[in-house]
Swiss-Prot record:
This is Transcription antitermination protein NusB. It comes from Streptococcus pneumoniae (strain JJA). The lineage of its organism: Bacteria, Bacillati, Bacillota, Bacilli, Lactobacillales. Belongs to the NusB family. Keywords: RNA-binding, Transcription, Transcription antitermination, Transcription regulation. SUPFAM superfamilies: NusB-like (SSF48013). GO terms for cellular component: cytosol. Involved in transcription antitermination. Required for transcription of ribosomal RNA (rRNA) genes. Binds specifically to the boxA antiterminator sequence of the ribosomal RNA (rrn) operons. GO terms for molecular function: RNA binding. GO terms for biological process: DNA-templated transcription termination; transcription antitermination. The gene is nusB.
Length: 140
């Protein structure tokens, strides 16, 4: 039986982030998603949730476009390459969810902040909050 926690969107976003990080080091979307979703489960033959696959494959497909959108909101002199891999992937995930899903914008921002707190530090969480909040404000 599937744990309710693994089926929550928050947990699926965490899996999506982990899969995106794996993709930075060379694997395919299916393998990265499967590992992130099943790494602590006994039954690894489960069907992957569509939300997880859609997030990861969408970010991968639009990575260049997302990076351009993120770069437009960085301070002068900053490049996307200057950001950590964690920050880059959290921002990509946040911007993609804001622009491509029916998730309320503030929910997408908050989820990215919470992931930053889990996988980085408070300074990174504040940076992600600022950039995504600016992005949302300018998109409206």
């Amino acid at each position: 039986m599937t744990s309710p926690l693994l089926e929550s969107r928050r947990q699926l976003r965490k899996c999506a982030f982990q899969a995106l990080m794996s993709l930075e080091f060379g694997t395919d979307v299916e393998t990265a998603c499967r590992f992130a979703y099943t790494h602590d489960r006994e039954d690894t033959a489960v069907q992957l949730p569509a939300f997880l696959i859609d997030l990861v494959s969408g970010v991968q497909a639009k990575k260049e476009e997302l990076d351009k959108q993120i770069t437009q909101h960085l301070k002068a002199g900053w490049t996307i390459e200057r950001l950590t891999l964690v920050e880059r992937n959290l921002l990509r995930l946040g911007v993609f969810e804001i622009t491509s899903f029916d998730t309320p914008q503030l929910v997408a921002v908050n989820e990215a902040i919470e992931l930053a707190k889990d996988f980085s530090d408070q300074k990174s969480a504040r940076f992600i909050n600022g950039l995504l909040s600016q992005f949302v404000t300018e998109e409206q």
